[in-house]
Regions:
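Extracellular/secretory-pathway and virion-surface proteins
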Residues: 1-100, 108-110, 117-122, 133-136, ...
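Surface-exposed, short loops/turns at beta-strand junctions within beta-sandwich domains
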Residues: 58-61, 175-182, 264-265
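Beta-strand signatures of extracellular beta-sandwich domains
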Residues: 6-8, 142-146, 235-239, 299
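Loop and turn regions of beta-sandwich accessory domains that flank beta-strands and are enriched
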Residues: 27-52, 57-59, 73, 208-328
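Extracellular/luminal regions of secreted and cell-surface proteins that mediate adhesion/ECM remodeling
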Residues: 70-218
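Short coil/turn segments at secondary-structure boundaries
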Residues: 20-21, 142-143, 285
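Solvent-exposed strand-loop boundary residues in beta-sheet-rich modules
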Residues: 11-13, 147-151, 193-195, 242-244, ...
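Solvent-exposed serine/threonine-rich low-complexity stretches and specific carbohydrate-binding patches
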Residues: 16-28, 152-165, 171-173, 247-254, ...
Length: 329
């Protein structure tokens, strides 16, 4: 259960946050067992959440201060042996070396990193994590981005980033022509608040593009549903990157087989299969599998019933797959 955690400084609650993590889209899957269940600040195999906050405005050099840590009271004792494990670090530093200094931390899309595998491969909107590491608040950023040997795109972002604040910025769709020959994608912050960044060493970042699977113009989604009412938890949608939906479905029947014919023109598409209970379509896993219903099945097949892509049933919250109809750009 989500609980509030508090830092108390000089007997005053100065910072609070919720400790709870959605594990249904854990990139490390399938694992077996209870891995999709939400947890207090962690998911099996992934990094523990961090909470960072600034103390500068609360203290003066040479001052003695007191710290205390408080957690919202737990009223549900069904997990009476549960405990919190935590560590705390205090960092002190001098004034920033630069006024205008934006760090490009990481590219989320497109990326070949395992940590972003749930939302890649994709040729959709690029997303980048940025951090203000200069003393000047950032209100405007000019981005240049695209394939290194391809056509560049430009985007002017407006917002507000204070010192040490992070943000995830989505960039408009870019031109992918030449992807077949060059899979290197870059994002560069050209100007900050209309002027050059004072530290250019962290203004450009490169990722490797994984090309989505190419599918035929006509293919079949084969779905075998669970029983015990779990089929009602499932739905699917096929759309393009402009948000236009071409196929969707829900309200499936238990213990049923569906062959859904898909016919699409050349283009870039996204398939998402949802499970509202975030436990996939596998049998409920870790104990007495044969007594808890049947396992579902999901896959793409060509019109001659040959498999194109078979998805694991133990997927947690959703299956997401971007794909190409027609030639690779």
């Amino acid at each position: 259960v989500s609980k509030s955690h508090y830092f108390i400084i000089n007997e005053s609650k100065e910072h609070s946050w919720k400790v709870w993590k959605d594990c249904g889209n854990n990139p490390i899957y399938p694992q077996g067992g209870t891995w999709p269940y939400d947890r207090a600040g962690w998911c099996p195999g992934t990094r523990v959440d961090e909470e960072v906050f600034e103390l500068t405005y609360l203290v003066n050099p040479g001052q003695t201060i007191t710290f205390d840590y408080e957690i919202e009271k737990m009223s549900d004792n069904t997990e009476e042996n549960g405990i919190y494990r935590m560590s705390h670090q205090l960092f002190s530093f001098g004034p920033p070396n630069f006024k205008r200094n934006l760090e490009l931390v990481d590219i989320i899309n497109p990326s070949s990193k395992d940590s972003y595998s749930r939302i890649n491969p994709t040729l959709g909107k690029a997303r980048v994590i940025v951090k203000n590491v200069g003393s000047e608040n950032i209100r405007r950023i000019k981005f240049l981005y695209g394939l290194i040997s391809g056509k560049m795109s430009t985007f002017h972002w407006r917002g507000y980033l204070k010192f040490l604040e992070k943000s995830i910025i989505s960039l408009p769709l870019n031109d992918w022509h030449g992807l077949k020959d060059d899979k290197r994608f870059f994002i560069e912050a050209v100007t900050i608040n209309g002027r050059k960044d004072e530290d250019y060493t962290d203004n450009k970042i490169i990722s490797e593009v994984q090309i989505p699977q190419v599918l035929p113009e006509s293919f079949v989604i084969k779905l075998k549903t669970n029983n015990y009412g779990r089929s009602r938890q499932n739905s699917y949608n096929i759309s393009d990157y402009n948000g236009n939906s071409f196929y969707s479905g829900s309200d499936f029947l238990d213990s049923s087989n569906y062959d859904i014919l898909i016919q699409l023109e050349n283009g870039l598409y996204r398939f998402v299969f949802y499970d509202s209970n975030e436990d996939g379509i596998d049998r409920l896993w870790w104990k007495e599998k044969d007594s808890v219903g049947i396992s579902g099945e999901l896959g793409f097949y060509d019109v001659e019933q040959n498999p194109l892509k078979v998805f694991p049933p133990d997927f947690g919250q959703e299956i997401r797959m971007d794909f190409i109809i027609g030639p690779i750009p």
